[in-house]
């Protein structure tokens, strides 16, 4: 059993990972500034897990609160989700993203070292591959040219953590590059909070389904794919959460930098996602095909074989379950955690 600090632990992926950690017998402390989440998730996490979870409201750039957390809790490892994640916003406000995502991660690493904690699992992204020109994506591909400050911030943090580990071999840096997380916890109690216009496909579909938006915009119908729409590797958020736990358990005591893809190894198109959601919900999702967005790729997906060999993890939940769990969450919580 380990005591894990989860930064961004009330966010979408962070909250589901908290559930997985507790289910696996670990203890958890959450740090979150609630800029993209809700305090109302905490009683729901208690309902799911049966445990009161220590929570600190604060920012990873705040050294004082980090020092207080490390002084008051015997932390063994950190799973680091805290960061801004809207691609479009990052293009408009790059300084905000580099300050939060890059400077924040550096402050966190410095305070971990000060406290004698040398194990971190970092929430990275497949965006660090850029456009390598071939699929599937494998961990030995070089870092690519990212298409947004969001993606660049993830790539920069990967480089920073890798350099820190080279200089100080006590560190275990676990860099998890994940693809497109969707779905929700099977209880319907936690899921993705619908704040504003969604950046990702499934939350957009869910807002149309719940009547918050009139129709779905499908960007690009002329890609070189079977139905002309973009294809992505979708992964159930609980599979993703379990991947974080598996990586932490397998590698947190193994010094080095560990790069791992977290994906299913399968690509699904936008129209396939729409049809799967319609099948799960019994609804019809109106959509309009619009021009491609700049920087969007036709198709990408993970090669998950290295990850399976390293930590014994692979996805368990199929597209139908992703849709069923998403629809349960949305239909039970049309306003997210504000109900």
UniProtKB/Swiss-Prot annotation:
Substrate binds at residues 125, 150, 180, 200-201, 217-219, 232, 293-296. It comes from the Bacteria. GO terms for biological process: galactose metabolic process. It catalyses: UDP-alpha-D-glucose = UDP-alpha-D-galactose. Its EC number is 5.1.3.2. GO terms for cellular component: cytosol. NAD(+) binds at residues 12-13, 32-37, 59-60, 81-85, 100, 125, 150, 154, 179. The keyword Transmembrane helix does not apply. Keywords: Carbohydrate metabolism, Galactose metabolism, Isomerase, NAD. Pathway: Carbohydrate metabolism; galactose metabolism. It is an enzyme of class 5 (isomerase). GO terms for molecular function: UDP-glucose 4-epimerase activity. InterPro entries: Epimerase_deHydtase, NAD(P)-bd_dom_sf, UDP_G4E. Its cofactor is NAD(+). The active site is at 150 (proton acceptor). Belongs to the NAD(P)-dependent epimerase/dehydratase family. Homodimer. Involved in the metabolism of galactose. Plays an essential role in the incorporation of galactose into meningococcal lipopolysaccharide surface molecules, which are important for pathogenesis. Catalyzes the conversion of UDP-galactose (UDP-Gal) to UDP-glucose (UDP-Glc) through a mechanism involving the transient reduction of NAD. This is UDP-glucose 4-epimerase. It comes from Neisseria meningitidis serogroup A / serotype 4A (strain DSM 15465 / Z2491). The gene is galE.
